[in-house]
Amino acid sequence: MSVQTSPSKQVTSGIQNLNMDSPAKKLDFGATDKENKPFDEDLAKLEAEIDAEHNANKKAAEAKKMAPTLKPEEANEPLLTENPQRFVLFPIKYHEIWQMYKKAEASFWTAEEIDLSKDLHDWNNRLNDDEKFFISHILAFFAASDGIVNENLVERFSGEVQIPEARCFYGFQIMMENIHSETYSLLIDTYIKEPSQRTYLFNAIDTIPCIRKKADWALRWITDKSSTFAQRLVAFAAVEGIFFSGAFASIFWLKKRGLMPGLTFSNELISRDEGLHTDFACLLFSHLNNRPSKQLIQEIIVDAVRIEQEFLTEALPCALLGMNADLMKQYIEFVADRLLVALGNEKIYRSTNPFDFMENISLGGKTNFFEKRVGDYQKAGVMNSTKKADADAEVAKNENGGDFTFDEDF
């Protein structure tokens, strides 16, 4: 009796007889045996690559402990050498620098707060052509200068200084310089109605030689690759402490005469801010270990004095406002002496303040003008967080180079 094969067995037998070889090329997994490699080996290889890249970056960072523009002698400057904590603000380590930032923050104001409604009447009816010429050119100088100060802060100082407390101040200073520039531009826009004259003033660095000369002096320090941070710090203290001083005084001269209330009020706010910026430069200078020689500091200041005196007595004579040129020279020397003392030098001019109307004007804002907020212009509560013991205040005072700060009354 024959055994009958079931249908299922027939199918199974047929499958076994099929030729499973394909004419196509077979995939060869055996060559690399990748599917059989333990996962840990791949992970170890990846970790090794990451470690190698990290070590390479670490070596590169070690080779750049200083910013490219810093000098070998600045390698031990805590303010300038690489600070791994620079991305985090707290805990505060430089309390006097932090207090300076909070003081600047409390003094915030905007261009919209300046009332220019009465200025146009004075401009059109109470000023002569010489006075208009002088004021318009002073405003043109200021409008350009604030941009130059910001150029230095953005391109050099903010990147070079490695401590977050100082970077906070510089960040706020940049904002305030923008507000100053906006204010001066707004003043020009308000007083000068002729479009071509406006363009001439807005482009003062290119169109007005005496302003270009002052701008070139400041710009040279920004681009100077051979000077140290300390030298440039002194130079820009001179820009804000000396280059602006005579112009501020000339506008306060208008206040004494009861002219241009909007201009003179903005001048008071801006002069206070610039005094604080100069104070801050002197404070940072006191934290440097390697400072320029007293002779070099004196040379920078004397050079700035010469340029400022020439600017306000020859190129754009203050006599146009009815001010005495010799007294203006003396006033610039008086301001320069105070800056020299703040930087740890001795006075060289020993000039007294020749302008009685400046006696009650403070670059720190301690005024008695109750009708405006300039005397106690502070945002509520901002300064409360900076209250320290008298000992801390004394330390900050000493580190400013003595008992002088630019917020003292003239």
UniProtKB/Swiss-Prot annotation:
Provides the precursors necessary for DNA synthesis. Catalyzes the biosynthesis of deoxyribonucleotides from the corresponding ribonucleotides. The lineage of its organism: Eukaryota, Fungi, Dikarya, Ascomycota, Pezizomycotina. It catalyses: a 2'-deoxyribonucleoside 5'-diphosphate + [thioredoxin]-disulfide + H2O = a ribonucleoside 5'-diphosphate + [thioredoxin]-dithiol. Fe cation 2 binds at E177, E240, E274, H277. Its EC number is 1.17.4.1. Residues 1-43, 55-78 are annotated as: Disordered. Binds 2 iron ions per subunit. Heterodimer of a large and a small subunit. It holds the Pfam family Ribonuc_red_sm. The active site is at Y184. One of its GO terms (biological process) is deoxyribonucleotide biosynthetic process. Keywords: Deoxyribonucleotide synthesis, Iron, Metal-binding, Oxidoreductase. Fe cation 1 binds at D146, E177, H180. One of its GO terms (molecular function) is ribonucleoside-diphosphate reductase activity, thioredoxin disulfide as acceptor. Its cofactor is Fe cation. This is Ribonucleoside-diphosphate reductase small chain. The keyword Metal-binding applies. Residues 23-43, 55-65 have a biased composition (Basic and acidic residues). It comes from the Eukaryota. Residues 1-20 have a biased composition (Polar residues). Belongs to the ribonucleoside diphosphate reductase small chain family.
